[in-house]
Amino acid sequence: MPYFESGRGRLHYRRWPVAEAGAVVALLPGSGQHSGHYHRFAKGLGEAGVELWALDTAGQGLSEGEGERPGTLRELCGDAAGFVAEVREGARVPVVLMGHSLGAATALGALDSGLVGVPAGLVVCGTPQTILRGEPPKSARGAGAGAGWTGAAPRLPEGLPVLVVHGVDDRRTPIDPVREWARTAGAEFREYADAGHDLLHEPVQAEVTADIAGWIGRMISNR
């Protein structure tokens, strides 16, 4: 099983190999989730020629750490940098960074800080509105201390293709601030009626997966 050493211990990740993949998604799950929750998503992406790698956040799945304390956002961004480095070394094809919920906040923070370089594209799902105000989400334990945020929305690399997917009925992260942020950031925005926070585990999951895979395919073909 693949692991890498982070500053906080050994972190596990999972890979679903795809022969002659055109792109790879490096997924940062949400709070309380791990790579084992994403077999169905991996299958859907794989059918479209996109390979999935997913991280077990510290304290989740097979990764070391405390399950109730995933870390500050700064620590999570450091973990993401190590994971993306592993993906880049093993993939040899364009890498799309993706995050769900806390993972979306981590992806945005890591891009803002330059820790993960510039991926081929970015997909965020269930994005916490707090991160769009420059505040770490509450699910990042202890995030208020030494998080390094300036109170401004995270900056995206110029020209980075971005897809934002969000459920209309998301009660954890209301859609309106995310829709407005996507508009001002020049991101492509997809919303899903009768869907909540965890789009990849709801009845709309097949549609969401197809939309993500299709967007990646078009983005890669236009490179």
Regions found by a protein language model. Give the residues of each.
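Primarily recognizes the serine-hydrolase "nucleophile elbow" in alpha/beta-hydrolase
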Residues: 92-139
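Short beta-strand/loop motif that positions the catalytic acidic residue
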Residues: 158, 164-166, 170
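Conserved alpha/beta-hydrolase
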Residues: 37, 42-65
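Catalytic active-site module of serine/aspartate enzymes centered on a nucleophile-bearing elbow/loop
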Residues: 194-223
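Active-site glycine-rich loops that stabilize anionic/oxyanionic intermediates
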Residues: 30-33, 168
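Conserved loop-alpha-helix segment in the C-terminal half of the alpha/beta-hydrolase fold
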Residues: 168-188
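N-terminal cap/lid segment of alpha/beta-hydrolase-fold proteins
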Residues: 1-20
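Alpha/beta-hydrolase active-site loop
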Residues: 70-89
